[in-house]
Amino acid sequence: MASLSHILVLCVGLLAMVNAEAPQEHDPFTYDYQSLRIGGLIIAGILFILGILIVLSRRCRCKFNQQQRTGEPDEEEGTFRSSIRRLSTRRR
């Protein structure tokens, strides 16, 4: 009877060791939110700094007319006819 109990204890011990050493399956629904949050903050910071550099560099070329005003108003700036002239010259 003693040998039967020894065999039973040995089998239970082996089963416990096999279950403890078995590789755990990858659960596809377990997410690492900490690394996702850090990655998002890094990308947001890079885009923010890139936007500030673009604004400060003044190298962004726009299609519309970028003539700087000299501070003196045009002689016909406020009239309806001059606004029509300005619009018609832009289309050419």
UniProtKB/Swiss-Prot annotation:
Major plasma membrane substrate for cAMP-dependent protein kinase (PKA) and protein kinase C (PKC) in several different tissues. Phosphorylated in response to insulin and adrenergic stimulation. Phosphorylation at Ser-88 stimulates sodium/potassium-transporting ATPase activity while the unphosphorylated form inhibits sodium/potassium-transporting ATPase activity. Phosphorylation increases tetramerization, decreases binding to ATP1A1 and reduces inhibition of ATP1A1 activity. Phosphorylation at Ser-83 leads to greatly reduced interaction with ATP1A1, ATP1A2 and ATP1A3. Residues 21-35 are extracellular. Residues 65-92 are annotated as: Disordered. One of its GO terms (molecular function) is sodium channel regulator activity. Residues 57-92 are cytoplasmic. It is a single-pass type I membrane protein. Gene3D superfamilies: Single helix bin. One of its GO terms (biological process) is potassium ion transport. The modification Phosphoserine is found at S82, S83, S88. InterPro entries: FXYD_motif, Ion-transport_regulator_FXYD, PLM. GO terms for cellular component: apical plasma membrane; caveola; intercalated disc; sarcolemma; sodium:potassium-exchanging ATPase complex; T-tubule. In the brain, detected in cerebellum and choroid plexus (at protein level). The modification Phosphothreonine is found at T79, T89. It is found in: Cell membrane, Sarcolemma; Apical cell membrane; Membrane, Caveola; Cell membrane, Sarcolemma, T-tubule. The modification S-glutathionyl cysteine is found at C62. Residues 1-20 form the signal peptide. Keywords: Cell membrane, Glutathionylation, Ion transport, Lipoprotein, Membrane, Palmitate, Phosphoprotein, Potassium, Potassium transport, Signal, Sodium, Sodium transport, Sodium/potassium transport, Transmembrane, Transmembrane helix, Transport. Homotetramer. Monomer. Regulatory subunit of the sodium/potassium-transporting ATPase (NKA) which is composed of a catalytic alpha subunit, an auxiliary non-catalytic beta subunit and an additional regulatory subunit. The monomeric form associates with NKA while the oligomeric form does not. Interacts with the catalytic alpha-1 subunit ATP1A1. Also interacts with the catalytic alpha-2 and alpha-3 subunits ATP1A2 and ATP1A3. Very little interaction with ATP1A1, ATP1A2 or ATP1A3 when phosphorylated at Ser-83. Interacts with the non-catalytic beta-1 subunit ATP1B1. PANTHER family: PHOSPHOLEMMAN (PTHR14132:SF12), SODIUM/POTASSIUM-TRANSPORTING ATPASE SUBUNIT GAMMA (PTHR14132). The cytoplasmic domain is sufficient to regulate sodium/potassium-transporting ATPase activity. Associates with and regulates the activity of the sodium/potassium-transporting ATPase (NKA) which transports Na(+) out of the cell and K(+) into the cell. Inhibits NKA activity in its unphosphorylated state and stimulates activity when phosphorylated. Reduces glutathionylation of the NKA beta-1 subunit ATP1B1, thus reversing glutathionylation-mediated inhibition of ATP1B1. Contributes to female sexual development by maintaining the excitability of neurons which secrete gonadotropin-releasing hormone. This is Phospholemman. It comes from Bos taurus. The lineage of its organism: Eukaryota, Metazoa, Chordata, Craniata, Vertebrata.
